[in-house]
């Protein structure tokens, strides 16, 4: 507590009526990446005590839903749900409160700390993976995701998992994070609705040629652009960057 009382953001939160100093982390992240906009429908996973909920409501002015195992003291204009985010019934409650799909899913949740770094890092990754799974269920195509992760040897693998699901992904530590903290925030923008993901391998037939002269193969109605390919060719391809409306691929083998 003594450290908190000397902390600039702790004092600022008290003065400005935020429930936690972490409110400024969300403000700073949103200033840089613009994930919450006016009218955004926002879900906050692990929302207690509610600092992020307060900021999300200010930024959005729309529907904001907070979920936590602990009871969240009521906040005006915000729906709070006490429940386990891994349970189907909780997800149904969230969907009902939203009245549709979310535009943004955020999570500043942290695991119960053991003091053993490898254990705490692994627990953080597990929690972040759970948040990603839930975000994929709740978000509309093109929606955004923000989650806190502890840095460590599994972080890069997790970052790659997020990159497979979103068109644009960033890792960022806001100024309000304590200098001694190992936390970092992962931001995913534009949730992909494509039936393919980067790194996947497919056998395809090139259907046509695009304006740039590259071959185009269709996978479940989704266009995949293949360089140096001609119509009628049968190819084994590896998916590269995936966009909202198309993907790129490289040729592994001509069949």
From Swiss-Prot:
Annotated EC: 2.1.1.166
Q: Where is the TRAM domain?
A: 195-253
The protein's UniProt keywords, in alphabetical order, are: Cytoplasm, Methyltransferase, rRNA processing, S-adenosyl-L-methionine, Transferase
* EC top class named in words: transferase
> Could you give one GO CC term from the UniProt record?
cytoplasm
Q: Which GO terms describe its molecular function?
A: rRNA (uridine-2'-O-)-methyltransferase activity
Q: Where in the cell is it found?
A: Cytoplasm
Q: Which cysteines are joined by disulfide bonds?
A: none
InterPro entries listed in its UniProt record:
NA-bd_OB-fold, RNA_methyltr_RlmE, RNA_MeTrfase_FtsJ_dom, rRNA-MeTfrase_E, SAM-dependent_MTases_sf, TRAM_dom
Please state the protein's primary subcellular location.
Answer: cytoplasm
Which residues take part in binding S-adenosyl-L-methionine?
50, 52, 68, 84, 108
Catalytic reaction list: uridine(2552) in 23S rRNA + S-adenosyl-L-methionine = 2'-O-methyluridine(2552) in 23S rRNA + S-adenosyl-L-homocysteine + H(+)
The residues annotated as the active site are 148 (proton acceptor)
Q: Which SUPFAM superfamilies match?
A: Nucleic acid-binding proteins, S-adenosyl-L-methionine-dependent methyltransferases
The family note in this entry says: Belongs to the class I-like SAM-binding methyltransferase superfamily. RNA methyltransferase RlmE family.
Job of this protein: Specifically methylates the uridine in position 2552 of 23S rRNA at the 2'-O position of the ribose in the fully assembled 50S ribosomal subunit.
List the HAMAP family.
Answer: RNA_methyltr_E
Name of the featured protein:
Ribosomal RNA large subunit methyltransferase E
Instruction: Name the species this protein comes from.
Output: Methanothrix thermoacetophila (strain DSM 6194 / JCM 14653 / NBRC 101360 / PT)
| Lineage start | Archaea, Methanobacteriati, Methanobacteriota, Stenosarchaea group, Methanomicrobia
